[in-house]
From Swiss-Prot:
Its main location: cytoplasm. This is Small ribosomal subunit protein eS26. Residues 85-115 are annotated as: Disordered. The keyword Phosphoprotein applies.
Length: 115
C-alpha cells in the first residue's frame, strides 16, 4: 500500500494507544493525537456591546475578561467547517505552520532577537 502521509495523519509515534476525545461539532470519538485542535480566545462581550459596557462601568481601568476555549475537531468536521483544507501531494510535504492571523488592532510583532 502507498502511504499518503509521513505521520499517517496522527502524532502517535511510539505509543500503542491514545485516549479518544469527542469532536466539538459532531461528538464522534477521535484519537486525541489525530484530532485537529483549535485554540480560540474571544472577548466574553461581543464587539458591538464593548463600548456600551465600558461607558457604564464604574471602574475606568477595568479590562473585560476573555473566553479561552480549546476546540477539538474530527477530520471530516474540520474540513467541512474550513479549519483545514485538503492539499496537493507536493503541498502535503510542506510542514511549515500557516501564517498567524492577527487582527488589525492587535499587538505588534515582537522585535528581532539580537545576535
Amino acid at each position: 500500500m502507498t502511504k499518503k502521509r509521513r505521520n499517517n495523519g496522527r502524532a502517535k509515534k511510539g505509543r500503542g494507544h491514545v485516549q479518544p476525545i469527542r469532536c466539538t461539532n459532531c461528538a464522534c470519538c477521535v484519537p486525541k493525537d489525530k484530532a485537529i485542535k483549535k485554540f480560540v480566545i474571544r472577548n466574553i462581550v461581543e464587539a458591538a456591546a464593548v463600548r456600551d459596557i465600558s461607558e457604564v462601568s464604574v471602574f475606568d481601568a477595568y479590562v473585560l475578561p476573555k473566553l479561552y476555549v480549546k476546540l477539538h475537531y474530527c477530520v471530516s468536521c474540520a474540513i467541512h467547517s474550513k479549519v483545514v483544507r485538503n492539499r496537493s501531494r507536493e503541498a502535503r510535504k510542506d510542514r511549515t505552520p500557516p501564517p498567524r492571523f492577527r487582527p488589525a488592532g492587535a499587538a505588534p510583532p515582537p522585535p528581532p532577537k539580537p545576535m
